[in-house]
Amino acid sequence: MLEKAPQKSVADFWFDPLCPWCWITSRWILEVAKVRDIEVNFHVMSLAILNENRDDLPEQYREGMARAWGPVRVAIAAEQAHGAKVLDPLYTAMGNRIHNQGNHELDEVITQSLADAGLPAELAKAATSDAYDNALRKSHHAGMDAVGEDVGTPTIHVNGVAFFGPVLSKIPRGEEAGKLWDASVTFASYPHFFELKRTRTEPPQFD
C-alpha cells in the first residue's frame, strides 16, 4: 500500500513594510521555504488601519501612523494591478531600504522599490490616494480578524490557523529556521493553543 505524500504546509503572511519585527519574521519565513516544503503567500495589512480608532497613542506614534498609509496603499495597488506575486519582491525592496539601509524617506523608498520590483512608476501615486483603501481594508481584515483585536503584525496563518508572531529579534537561518517552523506548525495544529510570550529584551537585528 502506497503511503500518501505529506501535505504541503501553507503560510499566509500579513505585513506592513514599516514594522521592524514583521520584517525579521518575513525574512525567517523565506528562510523556511529553503529548507521545508511550504508555500508562502504574502498579504498586506495596515498598522494605520489597526490603530486608526485608538485615542491613547503617543503623538510621535500617531504621526508615524499618518505616514504609514503610503507604502501599504502602493503595495495593495500593485497587487490589484499585477497580482499577489508582486508583493514578495516589492515588500523585500521596501523592507531592505527602510530597515537594513535605514531610509525613512518613504516617497523615495516607494519610488526606488517599485523600480527594483519591475513595477510601473505611476503606482507611486497610490500613496496619497484613497482609491485602493477598500481593497486595503479587505486584505487587512482577512488577516487580522481571525487573530483577534489585541495584536498587530507579524500575523501568520499556518495551514489556515491564525496567530500573532513569532516575534524574533534575529533572523534564523538554515535548519534553525526550519526547526522553528516545525514548532510553529505543531502549535498551530492544536486547536486549544493561544499564547506563549515573554518580554522582549533586545532590539531587532536585521543582519
Curated annotation (Swiss-Prot):
GO terms for cellular component: cytoplasm; peptidoglycan-based cell wall. It comes from Mycobacterium tuberculosis (strain ATCC 25618 / H37Rv). In vitro, the reduced form of Rv2466c catalyzes the reduction and activation of TP053, which is a thienopyrimidine derivative drug that can kill both replicating and non-replicating M.tuberculosis. It holds the Pfam family Rv2466c-like. Homodimer. Keywords: Cytoplasm, Oxidoreductase. This is Thioredoxin-like reductase Rv2466c. GO terms for molecular function: oxidoreductase activity. InterPro entries: Rv2466c-like (IPR053977), Thioredoxin-like_sf (IPR036249). It is found in: Cytoplasm.
